[in-house]
């Protein structure tokens, strides 16, 4: 679900927030993700735009998917779809802009190797917040700690 909801959301809005020219906090949305709309200044040497876009799309979906384990069995499907939409639209692109898109954290010299912060920390923090809001899996475990199947 994360990939089905997140891909069009990230391509239409999220990519611009993450890599569009803007300020240190968020980029400017310049239309659907394409080299014609955003240029090639953010591309690593020799990497075609579409390869970069797919790579970033998978990172966005990974960040959203990390949360599914923390929220499994405790959320309605429609609620999870709304969450997936919002993390792909706002949360991941803004934090990604700060770290990889020329935002204020990257301007301070921060380097994120392979998405440990931009992808995994964002997903982990969102999962932690979701688990706190949802509370324990009531009825899942007995008083002795064994699983009630």
Predicted regions and their residues:
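Hydrophobic alpha-helical transmembrane bundles of multi-pass membrane proteins
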Residues: 1-149
């Amino acid at each position: 679900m994360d990939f089905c909801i997140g891909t069009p959301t990230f391509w239409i809005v999220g990519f611009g927030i993450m890599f569009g020219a803007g300020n240190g906090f968020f980029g400017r949305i310049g239309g659907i993700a394409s080299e014609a709309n955003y240029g090639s200044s953010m591309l690593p040497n020799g990497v075609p735009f579409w390869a970069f876009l797919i790579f970033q799309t998978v990172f966005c979906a990974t960040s959203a998917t990390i949360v599914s384990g923390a929220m499994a069995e405790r959320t309605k499907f429609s609620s999870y779809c709304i969450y997936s939409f919002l993390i792909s639209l706002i949360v991941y692109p803004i934090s990604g802009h700060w770290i990889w898109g020329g935002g204020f954290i990257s301007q301070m010299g921060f380097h994120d190797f392979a998405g440990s912060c931009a992808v995994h920390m964002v997903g982990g923090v969102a999962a932690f917040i979701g688990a706190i809001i949802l509370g324990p899996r009531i009825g899942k475990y007995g008083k002795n700690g064994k699983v009630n199947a």
